[in-house]
Curated annotation (Swiss-Prot):
The keyword NADP does not apply. It is found in: Secreted. It comes from Tropidechis carinatus (Australian rough-scaled snake). Homodimer; non-covalently linked. GO terms for biological process: cell surface receptor protein tyrosine kinase signaling pathway; modulation of chemical synaptic transmission; negative regulation of neuron apoptotic process; nerve development; nerve growth factor signaling pathway; neuron projection morphogenesis. Residues 19-125 form a propeptide. This is Venom nerve growth factor 4. Gene3D superfamilies: Cystine-knot cytokines. Belongs to the NGF-beta family. Residues 47-66 have a biased composition (Basic and acidic residues). Nerve growth factor is important for the development and maintenance of the sympathetic and sensory nervous systems. It stimulates division and differentiation of sympathetic and embryonic sensory neurons as well as basal forebrain cholinergic neurons in the brain. Its relevance in the snake venom is not clear. However, it has been shown to inhibit metalloproteinase-dependent proteolysis of platelet glycoprotein Ib alpha, suggesting a metalloproteinase inhibition to prevent metalloprotease autodigestion and/or protection against prey proteases. Coiled coil: none annotated. One of its GO terms (cellular component) is axon. Residues 47-69 are annotated as: Disordered.
Length: 244
């Protein structure tokens, strides 16, 4: 009987010694530790995915300067387009810098400085007659280089005029030399021409236009078109019929 009791007690102690240890004392690499590491890695990966999705949904706002530079850089012109240019006008100018206010003694067809299209200057002289002192213009006019964004083409349609172009990684502006009446008056009676006999003629000064070939936008492509610009201030005379 005593031997049986001793045997049962020894078996009970052996069972207690062979019981599994707690998770707090589990060594690295055990199944319990692997489950914990996999769970933490999954949570970290999920956090990274959430952060990336948030950045994609809410991109960082661009600066206004970057947007302006990007819009200017989008209008890229092929240099071959200028080789096909015909009917060049002295009133159309492409330049990286503002042109002089007056053309002076030269009529510039295409302004090229050291950093321009062909690195040369093509100009022609204008022959100005010698004016005597005391001679006056019939109508006073004013001329200046201007930048146009829209204009009327030869078909009467309003077209978009290219203000800036990107050529060989440089930005050029398109200028137009316009001439118009200095003091335009919609009432012909109050804008009589100088030196016209008002007893025989009704006269008034008005601005006239002509067509020049300019670079315009047609859809997403640049193309040459004839557009109207102001080019002169002339005198219009009408014979009075009351005297006849």
């Amino acid at each position: 009987m005593s031997m049986l009791c001793y045997t049962l007690i020894i078996a009970f102690l052996i069972g207690i010694w062979a019981a599994p240890k707690s998770e707090d004392n589990v060594p690295l690499g055990s199944p319990a530790t692997s489950d914990l590491s996999d769970t933490s890695c999954a949570q970290t990966h999920e956090g990274l995915k959430t952060s990336r999705n948030t950045d994609q949904r809410h991109p960082a706002p661009k600066k206004a300067e970057d947007q302006e530079l990007g819009s200017a850089a989008n209008i890229i012109v092929d240099p071959k387009l200028f080789q096909k240019r015909r009917f060049q006008s002295s009133r159309v100018l492409f330049s990286t810098q503002p042109p002089p206010l007056s053309r002076g003694e030269q009529s510039v067809e295409f302004l090229d400085n050291e950093d321009t299209l062909n690195r040369n200057i093509r100009a022609k002289r204008e022959n100005h007659p010698v004016h005597n002192q005391g001679e006056h213009s019939v109508c006073d006019s004013v001329s200046d280089w201007v930048i146009k964004t829209t204009a009327t083409d030869i078909r009467g349609n309003v077209v978009t005029v290219m203000e800036d172009i990107n050529l060989n990684n440089e930005v050029y502006k398109q200028y137009f030399f316009e001439t118009k009446c200095r003091n335009p008056n919609p009432n012909p009676v109050q804008s009589e021409c100088r030196g016209i006999d008002s007893r025989l003629w009704n006269s008034y000064c008005t601005t006239t236009q002509t067509f020049v070939r300019a670079l315009t936008m047609e859809g997403n492509q640049a193309s040459w078109r004839f557009i109207r610009i102001d080019t002169a201030c002339v005198c219009v005379i009408i014979r009075k019929t009351d005297n006849f």
